[in-house]
């Protein structure tokens, strides 16, 4: 079974191999470009978000800085706003509906690690998709964990 198949099934996996490192580097470079745009470069930011995200609806704005692992696993609906310091650890899909607002310092992590220390030290992790439905507001410093709907 491939790493990607293990990821999609919620099984334990390591995130090395099968081109995964290169995909994360690609995302980091695009996010770096986004985070270093000037405040008036809103058109450039919109272009970059379309490159970073798997799906990008209309009227999306993310205050820099923000961070993502892959970007392509994040699917955002229309009228989305995220304040400063959004972190999305998108080893697997994150679905964000329409009219969603996210306050500062929010982490969305569909990826977790085993609680058993002997298993955890092997470097394995698991991922379960996260879905944030329409018209949701997420308060400051919230942490969204694997499998949340």
Descriptions of predicted regions:
Residues 66-76, 81-149:
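Flexible, glycine/small-residue-enriched loop-and-beta-strand segment within the central core
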Residues 1-59:
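Terminal amphipathic alpha-helical/low-complexity segments used for targeting or macromolecular assembly
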